[in-house]
Amino acid sequence: MSRHKSKSIPGRNLRLADQIQKDLAGIIQREIDMTRAGLITLSGVELSADYAHAKVYFTVLGAEPDTAAALLNEKAGWLHSQLYKLLHIHTVPTLRFVHDPQITRGIEMSMLIDRANRPGPHSGVPDEPEDQS
């Protein structure tokens, strides 16, 4: 009995994930009224090995992440059908939208660093010493 070699194309997973992210961002921007969900940015797509499932990571400004996730997941079936029209692949993955906490945490860390570097009585950085000439 012979073994079948993997027919996986190197880098295909990453290229497909990038294409899905790009296409979804365009569809969401053009076709869906997301006023209740705030400003949504897709930050990444993670595909399963068989391309059947995709976790779509997003960040949101101006709304609660849970609200945005609920609206996006409510539209996931319709978004899947729109992707099917754009992507020329046999299996378009089912979509699940997940808030990306990494971006939010990065913003919080940046704000803490800015606050720590700001001179003043509550910043932790001493004021410039007065010139005693």
Swiss-Prot record:
Top-rank lineage group of the source organism: Bacteria
Gene Ontology annotations for the cellular component aspect, listed alphabetically: cytosol
A GO molecular function held by the record: ribosomal small subunit binding
Main localisation: cytoplasm
Example GO BP: maturation of SSU-rRNA
Keyword field: Cytoplasm, Ribosome biogenesis
Subcellular location(s) per record: Cytoplasm
Reported function: One of several proteins that assist in the late maturation steps of the functional core of the 30S ribosomal subunit. Associates with free 30S ribosomal subunits (but not with 30S subunits that are part of 70S ribosomes or polysomes). Required for efficient processing of 16S rRNA. May interact with the 5'-terminal helix region of 16S rRNA.
Quaternary state and interactors: Monomer. Binds 30S ribosomal subunits, but not 50S ribosomal subunits or 70S ribosomes.
Similarity section: Belongs to the RbfA family.
PANTHER family according to UniProt: RIBOSOME-BINDING FACTOR A, CHLOROPLASTIC-RELATED
Protein name in the entry: Ribosome-binding factor A
Protein's gene: rbfA
